[in-house]
């Protein structure tokens, strides 16, 4: 069997990720749980992470069913950046589904061997109540999980979690240490923290959803994998500016509002996120939480890095000490790396890829 994979070309990024294609001979473990068919489902297909994952899955040889929701007027979004991807005409199907109507995901899931649940029903800075957001998030998740069981073909379920589920853990590394998958945020620690950069609704809903997914998998014999990710940065094929890219480049955008500044920036390249998901899909055994974070930089290091590597933006000299920033701890990806995964991108690729995409779309 031959599979075709596209490597990112950091010198010539385009709307489809850029780069030259090379043929790879699939090893015997690819894909172990997908021997009969390479059909997978990706929810929230129009988003930053999901769209890049879809691109990589198609390049890897999988057939993909992507779900998207309609806009506020009930019309489908412009998803030409998905439908025009290489191999999309042969192996990509688009389904309309909404987390407010969990049963709407059933047609997309039927017959799939794996489901990547990337969709989340809110923005991290939303002002909706915790109860409203958490109820909608968990109900949507549970509906999708039940559809996975009903399909009788889904072997592995992936939930895209967030580093907010481990950042606010008080004594368990809350003093600026490093945390791993054994740590869970304490909601009260988060609420008592003076400087916050996300809403309590986002923190509580992500924790509730990840916990519910893991518990559901344990009770029903479904392999559940959760990928705990920090700021995801790098190039993007989606049409809008991803919020995580904007936050990471806030200084270049001339935005020094404190809500966009952190004591420590934990980041990972978008392609490493997609690669990690596919890696865990293709492993014969994968279960539970995996932190996926590769770069950790202090705020002054980010400022110095951007000023030095990208002098054309002429960042102003400022006293960063005057800003009240949220303090965050380090993240350990030891479990993921011990499983055999290798991160491919560092800080320079993370920032340069994001900047090129922003420039190509007129955001910078």
UniProtKB/Swiss-Prot annotation:
Its main location: cytoplasm. Residues 1-22 are annotated as: Disordered. It is an enzyme of class 1 (oxidoreductase). It comes from the Eukaryota. Disruption phenotype: Abnormal organs elongation leading to long inflorescences, leaves and petioles, especially in the light. Induction: Down-regulated in the dark. GO terms for molecular function: oxidoreductase activity. Keywords: Brassinosteroid biosynthesis, Cytoplasm, Developmental protein, Lipid biosynthesis, Lipid metabolism, NADP, Oxidoreductase, Steroid biosynthesis. GO terms for biological process: brassinosteroid biosynthetic process; brassinosteroid metabolic process; regulation of brassinosteroid biosynthetic process; response to absence of light. It is found in: Cytoplasm. InterPro entries: Epimerase_deHydtase, NAD(P)-bd_dom_sf, NAD(P)_dehydrat-like. Its EC number is 1.1.1.-. The active site is at 206 (proton donor). Residues 1-11 have a biased composition (Acidic residues). Monomer. Belongs to the NAD(P)-dependent epimerase/dehydratase family. The ben1-1D (bri1-5 enhanced 1-1dominant) activation-tagging mutant suppresses the bri1-5 weak mutant allele of the brassinosteroid receptor gene BRI1. This is Protein BRI1-5 ENHANCED 1. The gene is BEN1.
